[in-house]
A protein has these predicted regions:
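Secreted glycan hydrolases and related glycan-binding modules that recognize and/or cleave
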Residues: 1-298
Length: 298
């Protein structure tokens, strides 16, 4: 098995989002995808930003500039009917691609304020609501399709009316956002608590606290290869105790974190956790976290 193969993932991994290269799959990659879904039961999702209609799903020959792309999808600025029709076309293209490769759903990376791209769709609250109202008919718990719809990133910007459209809310609870990590970088139980409280306060009018909590997943940034091999960064308990990184790095801390409300969280995970594939043993800290969160019954 090579590090890039899905079958190399830890056995008990419930869900993985593919950030790049998730379309135009070779026969070998299709077989690998089927194998991990069928033999390990792992849900495999496509992942995309939605800064503008067509993001991630525009044919290359039309993705040359904004005007050509918008003409392809039928987007016309300030024309509500045209915009909604273009959104319908975009949602259908996403769904068609997911069904073509039999992915298990879509993970929307929703970062309107921090993704560095000026987006006509994701930076307009009304347009986001329109698009999610359309997309939820194809994917997610409202669609009866059996396909998942999850969202990660700036969860506090997700329209309240759309909260029930998602199977999971993935918090980017990163110790570091990018660049060279500081030697003291870390995360804490209290930060996880506040992230959960934030979305409970936002979505509490349309979902129960238990429903929100059980859909909430916390994730660490494993982009720094050396830190991925060490299981992340420092982890601090609610009482202020900073644990020994060699014993409980942040990835393991997130796995162990239990919400104070007594409800079960959705889970834990990592961005670019594939950097841990070369660990000894492979995915050492991810496996340790899975075992800590869901102890095996002997």
């Amino acid at each position: 098995l090579t590090a890039s193969m899905l079958m190399g993932l830890p056995d008990s991994m419930d869900m993985v989002s593919l950030w790049d290269n998730s379309s135009n799959l070779s026969q070998g990659k299709i077989e690998d995808l089927r194998m991990v879904q069928q033999k390990k039961g792992t849900k495999v999702l496509m992942c995309t930003f939605i800064q503008y209609v067509g993001k991630g799903f525009t044919p290359a020959e039309y993705d040359v500039d904004e005007a050509t792309r918008e003409a392809f999808w039928g987007w016309v600025d300030d024309d509500e009917a045209a915009i909604k029709t273009s959104m319908e076309k975009y949602a259908q293209a996403i769904a068609d691609t997911i069904y073509k490769y039999n992915y298990d759903g879509l993970d929307i990376d929703f970062e309107p304020n921090v993704d560095g791209v000026v987006g006509k769709l994701d930076e307009n609250d009304t347009y986001v609501r329109w698009f999610l109202d359309i997309l939820c008919k194809h994917l997610g718990p409202q669609s009866n399709s059996g396909k998942m719809l999850v969202i990660d990133g700036e969860l506090w910007k997700v329209p309240v009316s759309a909260a029930t459209y998602f199977d999971y809310f993935i918090g980017q609870a990163y110790s570091v956002s990018g660049g060279t990590p500081s030697p003291n970088a870390g995360q804490s139980e209290s930060n996880m608590d506040s992230r959960l409280t934030q979305i409970i306060n936002r979505f509490g009018g349309v979902m129960s606290e238990e429903e929100i909590t059980k859909r909430f997943i916390v994730t660490e940034n494993m982009e720094s290869a050396i830190d991925a091999l060490n299981g992340g960064y420092f982890w601090t308990l609610r009482n202020g105790t900073r644990l020994d990184k060699a014993e409980c790095p942040s990835l393991l801390g997130m796995a162990r974190w239990q919400p104070v409300n007594g409800f079960r969280k959705g889970g834990f995970g990592g961005y670019r956790f594939s950097n841990e594939a070369v660990n000894k043993p492979s995915y050492k800290w991810m496996r340790t976290g899975i075992q800590a969160q869901n102890p095996a019954v002997n």
